[in-house]
Each structure stands twice: as structure tokens, then as C-alpha cells.
Amino acid sequence: MHRFRASRADLICGRSVICAATLATIVAVAHLHGTQPAGPFEVVLAGGRVMDPASGLDGVRHIGIRDRQIAAVSTAPLTGVTTIDVSGLVVSPGFIDPHAHAQSLEGNRFQARDGVTTALELESGAMPMNDWYQSREGQALLNYGATVGHISSRIAVMHAKERWSEISAMRQDTSDPRPDWTHKKATPAQIDAMIGHLERGLVAGALGVGMGPAYTPGASREELLRVFELAARRKVLAFIHMRSAGEVEPGGSIDALQEVLANVAATGASVHIVHITSMGLGQTPRLLSMIDGARARGLDVTTELYPYTAASTYLQSALFEPGWQGRFGISFKDVQWAATGERLTEETFTRYRARGGFVVIHMIPEEALRAALTHPTVMVGSDGVPLTNGGGHPRGVGTYARVLGRYVREEKVIDLMTALRKISLMPAQRLELFVPAMRRKGRIAVGMDADLTVFDPARVIDRATFDKPAQFSEGIRHVLVGGTFVVRDEQLVPQVAPGRPIRTQP
């Protein structure tokens, strides 16, 4: 496989060193100095502050939309069937969430109000792929796509199921805290069967391979190596929730990252590591330096964060095997039962773990979050999961407004253009070499998809909290998916479903 030497100048383009940003810049500049297409357009966003991280454009423009695409970006006024005055507001590429587990209508609604136009399930993935895509066709508010999941393949093989309507790590059976698929070592024949499932998923258009060895401690190093070999052979991205977290070594986050980097080096696979802050905790800067070193030596590695100091997962998962307090540096009171918001005791921990359900884990240092957010190659992904009776982690509801409101406007940790790059362009660039449809996203230029977010930079903020997560973000004025409004005047638009599937096929 072709190799290259990555550098900071590459940012997050992965192997695509000559980014589509260059092409977008050329197209936009040529268009601005040429003849505008004739109107009227279906929709015109008039007089907004257009910010395009790909070209660096930051100025007042008028955007014309036709046939789901951006048809004009003009300094002169345009005529539209529907014209919306967006003066005083920022018009940016729609936000792309590479780590969205809440693949439901409710999840879409929360994310739309947070400015998201594309929500991808890339960590856990799903299976079978055709079933997963067909179940969402014509019903999605946002663009959608998924990897084929290693965990899902493990469930299928270890439970000897011939066919499942949909297998997903986000739909675990909670009746057994130690099912075979989590803790049992697979035989060579079973690993072969898993690889077969994954390969069929890739043929069906999955966006890559998703892995979560933290949830499958029975998966051997050989098993994971086989998955990395498959990703390299099929030339797709691998997404991974690393095997272990925390600062206690061996068996902590450095150990886990070394396993990932060794597999990348040995196979030539491209990898994206999810939520680096909840893996590294106080060691996050050290992990980022390891990733920098790997990239400088030609390995194709990227990562992400979510802007919260708490993680979330299933209480019955392998992450809470004995010794978790020492590994994570926390105690029972730092674990919050999502359904009620209560902090746990030893007694309630034992009771709820036997029942199964989501918890919020308060364990990420603010300094680790800021180190990742300011790092030039780290993008944003929510890791949002479905709420349970209105309870849960707020990251699936307020991630993007939180970045813009708290970390840009209020605390000035990063500037606005940098933030927009991390929440729109960078995820598109990371995927575009492997998924051609992503070349048309994350950018404002003629010919790009009309996935656009319009927000008030003076008002945008998250309102979702750990105690009350089911609260929409504020200041996201309009959101368009393929040129169709899904949010207008900060209200969800009823009876629209413009979301389109994103698969590896163009």
C-alpha cells in the first residue's frame, strides 16, 4: 500500500495530503469572479457571514441552493423562491458527527438542533449492513452511515446466530454480565467467521470497520490483528475504542495505544481512535505525543474528543470489571445512573450492574480536554447515545453548541474558524479518501452538498446538562440537509426526512 510521511501541515487529511480543500478553494474563487448561475434558486441564504474552513473564506456572501447542492456563492444578491435573511449570523458547513450512536428520530432531532447534518455510527458499527440502511431509508432527518462492527460480528459468531435483523453493540442483551461474545476467546474458525461477516459488510457499503476491544476483553491480539489486516487489504478506515483506559500501567491507555500503533505499523491500515480524552484521562497529552510521533513516521492515525469531563457507557460492560476504581482513579460517587441522575454507592452499583443500563462516569480532567481540543489534528465527535426516559449523557444533545459557545466564545480556548474546521471539514477529510460522498461535505463551495448550519455566534450555547440532558441547544437558527430545512428559526421542521445514506459507493 502506498505510504507517505505525515506532518502537522497535513492536519487531519490522513493519506489525502493534497486535500479537497485546494479544489474547493479553486472552485469557489473561480465562481466568485465569474458569472453567477441564473436564478431563481430554490433557497437563498442572504447576507450571512459565510465561514468555509476549506478555502478560508470568511465574509458576507449570498448562497443559492438548487437540487440539494450549493449552486452559487456570491457577493451580489441572489433571487430565490425562498429567501432567508441571515445577516448577522454565521453560515458554516453542516456539522459532521463521526461518532453518533443515537441513530433514532429522537437522536436526530436533538442533533439537528445542535447543528449536525450528518451523523455516522463509526465506532460500534452494525450488521447486517443492508438491513441497517434499509431500516432508515426515507425516515432520517440527518445523513447517516455506519461501519460494519467487529463487536457485532463477535455477537453473531459467539451466539451462533444465522441471521439477525440488526446486530449492534448499542443493543446489548443485559441479562448476562459475562456473555460469551465479551469474554470468551475465539477459536481460529470463529475468527475466520467474524472476518467473513466483516468482509460482507464492506462489500455492502459499510464505511469501514468499527472495533471496541474494551468491550470484548476475550478478543485476542491475533483476532484484532486479523481485523486490521482486513481493513488494510480492503483499503478502508478502522475505527477503534482502545482496549484499556486510565493511567495505571501495564494495562492502561499507553499500553492500549501501543497495541493500536503496532497493528497499524504491521498492516499499513488507517485508523481513527475514538474519544482520546476518556481513554487517556490525565495521560491524554502523552497519548497525543505518541500519535504525533506515529504520524511523523508515516502512520495514518487520527483521533477525536467530546467536550465534556465525563464519559458514559453500559454499567454491565467489561469496563467495570474488578479494579475499575484504581484504573480510572475514581470511586462509586463518580458514577451516575443515567435514568435517574443519582450518584452510586457500593450497594446501588452492585444492584444496577446486575440489571444493566447506562451510567455517566465523571473522570476526565478539564486540562486533558483542553489539550486535545487545542491539538491541531484532533476533531470532535459526540459519542452520543440514546437518552433513557430523558436521562443520560448530554453529549448527544449539546456537543457542538458547547464547543462554539463555551470553548470558543466564552473561554476562547480555540478560535471560531478552528472550531468549524474540527466539527465539519476535518471529519469529511478523514473519510473522503475511502468514502467518495464525503468529498462534497464539510465545505461551502459551488457543487458541494447543501448541508449548512446557520447560527448566532453571540448566542449559541448548549443547555443539556448531566442532570437534565434532554434540553435543546440555543442559537442554532437554521439547519439544512441537502437544501431542505430541518431546523428553521430554532424550531424543528415537521414531516421532513431529507437525510440520505452514505456508503462507500459514490
Task: Go through each PLM region and give its residues.
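N-terminal secretory signal peptides that target proteins for export/translocation
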Residues: 1-13
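Short, acidic/polar
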Residues: 103-109, 190-199, 256
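Alpha-helix-loop-beta-strand connector modules within alpha/beta enzyme cores
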Residues: 139-144, 227-236, 240, 266
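Metal-associated gating/positioning segment near the N- to mid-region
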Residues: 76-81, 85-139, 252
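Histidine-centered catalytic micro-motifs
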Residues: 94-103, 213, 238-244
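Active-site-adjacent beta->alpha loops and helix N-cap segments on the catalytic face
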Residues: 127-130, 218-224
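Active-site microenvironment of metallo-dependent hydrolases
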Residues: 13, 21-61, 66, 75, ...
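Active-site neighborhoods of metal-dependent hydrolases
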Residues: 148, 154-221, 261-265, 269-416
